[in-house]
């Protein structure tokens, strides 16, 4: 089951949990209200035939999908890619990920610019809105396999912070003010 919490400010190994003392957890409804990040639980034993996933793909027009495996054995330029994934950035399109195997962390900024860490495992699907600053890292198991979904041709272009003048960032900030 997915968990989310506010992170400490430690610069220790990014693959650790980084809980505050005491821990400050946040549930998925509150995460959505504060950030626009959506969470869905998909049947981890048969995710591609999951009714919820099929419905989401149709409603949101996800027309392209692929898989990514992040491990030292499977990902070319592993260390460089992980460094890029963990650099704070945003995208012009929403980022949709369904975890098939393994686990990892998506970190997103809240309205006060604090980090919220989202721990994802098989069956967890998250949708990170366009324009939100975020990053990704593996946990201490160093392995994740995930489906990626796109509308049309896949575009995965990170725009590193600062990117506050980008239209997608301005649109995101507007939604943040009005509420998701």
Curated annotation (Swiss-Prot):
Transmembrane segments: none annotated. Fe(2+) binds at residues 89, 91, 95, 134. Its cofactor is Fe(2+); Ni(2+). Its EC number is 1.13.11.54, 1.13.11.53. InterPro entries: ARD, ARD_euk, RmlC-like_jellyroll, RmlC_Cupin_sf. Pathway: Amino-acid biosynthesis; L-methionine biosynthesis via salvage pathway; L-methionine from S-methyl-5-thio-alpha-D-ribose 1-phosphate: step 5/6. Keywords: Amino-acid biosynthesis, Cytoplasm, Dioxygenase, Iron, Metal-binding, Methionine biosynthesis, Nickel, Nucleus, Oxidoreductase. Ni(2+) binds at residues 89, 91, 95, 134. Binds either 1 Fe or Ni cation per monomer. Iron-binding promotes an acireductone dioxygenase reaction producing 2-keto-4-methylthiobutyrate, while nickel-binding promotes an acireductone dioxygenase reaction producing 3-(methylsulfanyl)propanoate. PANTHER family: ACIREDUCTONE DIOXYGENASE. This is Acireductone dioxygenase. It comes from Pediculus humanus subsp. corporis. The lineage of its organism: Eukaryota, Metazoa, Ecdysozoa, Arthropoda, Hexapoda.
